[in-house]
């Protein structure tokens, strides 16, 4: 997170609150030197006095098993430590008996990483050396990421705190889904996303490769799929193999998704004979649910799918394959005489039963290919075998229902990033809350969860700021114990991890400034940056209603520049909550908040001046008009509260009306501090 012109004063005040003794209630420290910035938090952590000082003589060695995958992981971790410290640490192993870091691994792990891979590790750091132990190479990878995060400055040195960590994930399936069907994402985006995933211990890259808007994977068996269904934007088989290898080198599985029988316009443009009735003439540019679908009644459909999936399993070795299965709406399934006759002959009472029949047929193909089926929660049907995995996107109820029926499940409801919700809200969604009324055996069926980044309103320029750093907070929910729920401390650590992710090459912090410069055509964006820091995109649905986005919409507006859940949201909320605990005594927080509100008011004239020469920036002119009044309201509220005086009659009503106006649609962006400001107003007496 950058401070600088936005408000170093505010940032310092907020951090002073966060770095307090109460901030570490979950992970008490025995050594004042140690600041627990780990994300995700480990299962067990103990701290002892002391530290291991890092010097250019720092070296590493291995004992037990080693291979090229492990060596590469260690060298990558050491390279990151070099960048973090500026120390000239040699990138080669020494004798384990004389090195500061010893990595001891029991074995390679599985030839094809699976959901059952042992990811546990232990890390012991003394003032003399650090020892990382793991049963598998993947476990060592997880421990190395913890080691990187433990490095911290101490005076004019960099040190590792003396800690003992025993760690393993709460859930075995911790994924991130990237939709490359609606908007294609270049290989570079995919690779840096995988780098970010590894840093926060995610282990499944769910690659959404087909959609109504595009077929993104090369098929040599059916070349028209990309020739007619991709606009030339697709991954060659060699590129896909490269991504699989890149992910494996970081302990991440790649699970491909091929949408069927719905969301299949791109299939049917190329092979119209597979359609249930009408066939599309071009890939779909609009978003939403299409009424085209593969025909479940034709044997030709299954022969096609068999040949296609056989080809794809030669590229994607993971034992799980996602068939989509959601939002299948085909009028022909209710009206076509031929399809209705088929349903009658097979005793299929409705379209849901017909789709279950389709899923069963596809499942037989996958079984022959030694693959497990995954699908969105619409596939849940008693006719399916129990080894099918149900991914819940419409709510946690379907996840629980599936477990009650004996199905393994993944939760994505609550982790949809296109809703532009704050990290803190995602963070408190639990795939398996203690309140879930499941038996111990049923609870084991909940494999974990996946973050979902749908691509209707993102492209290669904006994806990083939509995925990161919020995904890091969700990654902690998947890895750490259920008891780790301190939202304030999560945000404190998220700030540190966000900077670490930027160091890996992610653009989530730099993209905003670059976009603001492009909007205005100038490098003079100090005041615009400050103005932008309190605005964020509205949700996917709100934006669609206001802008009617399609695949052809150019994503270069102010809404595309600003980040969801920018740091100011939590910083201001934290300061206001603290101030409201003792408004008559807490002069320090009042001073910090007054300074911040004044900065917001002062930023507006320069921004309005820039709007005169930037039509795209002028789209948020109403927000520029509203900000000074909102900031003034905050100052007034604190003045009444700190003095212990009442506001004039009607003051609260007029200010709440101002809030209501500021919450109405304008410029496809919303203010980040409205809820916190409302709490200030509510505390004032009249």
Range-by-range predicted roles:
Residues 31-32, 38-41, 46-47, 54-56, ...:
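Substrate-binding groove of N-acetylhexosamine-processing glycoside hydrolases
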Residues 324-341, 346-348:
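N-terminal leader/propeptide and maturation segments of large enzyme subunits in energy/redox metabolism
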Residues 26-171, 478-481, 485-487, 492-504:
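Contiguous, structured surface segment used for ligand recognition
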Residues 107-109, 260-262, 326-330, 379-381:
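Short, internal active-site loops enriched in acidic
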Residues 11-21:
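Bacterial N-terminal signal peptides
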Residues 1-12:
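Bacterial N-terminal signal peptides that target proteins for export
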Residues 88, 203, 253, 372, ...:
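Residue-level detector of anion-binding/catalytic polar loops
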Residues 80, 110-320, 336, 361, ...:
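Feature activates predominantly on carbohydrate-active enzymes
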């Amino acid at each position: 997170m950058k401070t600088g012109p936005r408000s170093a004063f505010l940032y310092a005040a907020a951090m002073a609150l966060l770095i307090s003794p109460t901030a570490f209630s979950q992970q008490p420290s025995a050594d004042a030197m140690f600041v627990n910035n780990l994300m995700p938090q480990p299962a067990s952590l103990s701290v002892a006095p002391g530290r291991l000082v890092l010097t250019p003589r720092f070296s590493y060695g291995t004992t037990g098993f080693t291979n090229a995958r492990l060596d590469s992981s260690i060298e990558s971790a050491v390279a990151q430590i070099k960048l973090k410290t500026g120390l000239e640490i040699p990138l080669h192993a020494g004798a384990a008996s004389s090195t500061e870091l010893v990595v001891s691994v029991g074995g390679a792990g599985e030839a094809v990483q699976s959901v059952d891979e042992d990811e546990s590790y232990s890390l012991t750091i003394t003032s003399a050396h650090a020892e990382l132990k793991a049963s598998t190479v993947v476990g060592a990878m997880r421990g190395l990421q913890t080691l990187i995060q433990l490095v911290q400055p101490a005076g004019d040195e960099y040190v590792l705190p003396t800690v003992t960590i025993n760690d393993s994930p709460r859930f075995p399936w911790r994924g991130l889904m990237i939709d490359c069907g609606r908007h294609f994402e270049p290989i570079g985006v995919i690779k840096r996303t995988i780098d970010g995933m590894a840093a926060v211990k995610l282990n499944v890259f769910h690659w959404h490769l087909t959609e109504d808007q595009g077929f993104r994977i090369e098929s040599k068996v059916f070349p028209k799929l990309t020739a007619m269904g991709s606009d030339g934007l697709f991954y060659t088989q060699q590129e896909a193999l490269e991504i699989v290898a890149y992910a494996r080198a970081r302990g991440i599985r790649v699970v491909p998704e091929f949408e069927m029988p719905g969301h299949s316009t791109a299939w049917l443009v190329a092979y119209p004979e597979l359609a249930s009735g009408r066939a599309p003439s071009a890939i779909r540019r609009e978003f939403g649910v299409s009424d085209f679908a593969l025909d479940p009644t034709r044997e030709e459909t299954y022969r096609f799918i068999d040949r296609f999936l056989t080809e794809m399993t030669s590229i994607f070795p993971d034992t799980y394959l996602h068939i989509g299965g959601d939002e299948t709406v085909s009028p022909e399934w209710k009206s076509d005489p031929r399809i209705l006759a088929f349903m009658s002959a097979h005793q299929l009472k409705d379209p849901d039963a017909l789709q279950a029949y389709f899923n069963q047929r596809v499942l037989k193909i996958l079984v022959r290919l030694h693959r497990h089926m995954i699908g969105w929660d619409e596939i849940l049907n008693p006719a399916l075998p129990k080894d099918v995995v149900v991914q819940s996107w419409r709510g946690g109820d379907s996840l629980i229902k599936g477990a009650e029926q004996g199905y393994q499940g993944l939760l994505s409801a609550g982790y949809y990033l296109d809703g532009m919700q704050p990290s803190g809200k995602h963070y408190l969604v639990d795939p398996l809350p203690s309140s879930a009324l499941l038996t111990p055996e049923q609870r084991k069926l909940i494999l974990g969860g996946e973050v979902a980044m749908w691509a209707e309103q993102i492209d290669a320029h904006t994806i990083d700021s939509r995925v990161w750093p919020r995904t890091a907070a969700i990654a902690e929910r998947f890895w750490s114990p259920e008891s780790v729920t301190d939202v304030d401390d999560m945000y404190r650590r998220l700030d540190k991890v966000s900077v670490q992710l930027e160091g890996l090459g992610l653009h989530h912090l730099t993209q905003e400034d670059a976009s603001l410069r492009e909007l205005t055509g100038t490098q003079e964006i100090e005041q615009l940056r400050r103005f932008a820091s309190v605005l964020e995109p509205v949700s996917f649905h709100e934006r669609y209603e206001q802008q009617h986005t399609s695949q052809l919409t150019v994503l270069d507006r102010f809404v595309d520049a600003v980040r969801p859940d920018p740091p100011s949201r939590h910083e201001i909320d934290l300061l206001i909550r603290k101030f409201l605990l003792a408004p008559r005594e807490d002069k320090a927080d009042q001073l910090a908040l007054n300074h911040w509100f004044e900065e917001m008011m002062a930023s507006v004239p320069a921004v309005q001046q820039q709007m005169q020469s930037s039509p795209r920036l002028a789209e948020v002119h109403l927000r520029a008009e509203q900000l000074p009044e909102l900031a003034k309201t905050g100052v007034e509220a604190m003045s009444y509260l700190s003095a212990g005086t009442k506001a004039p009659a009607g003051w609260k009503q007029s200010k709440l009306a101002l809030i209501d106006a500021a919450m109405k649609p304008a410029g496809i962006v919303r203010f980040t501090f409205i809820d916190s400001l409302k709490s200030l107003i509510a505390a004032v007496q009249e």
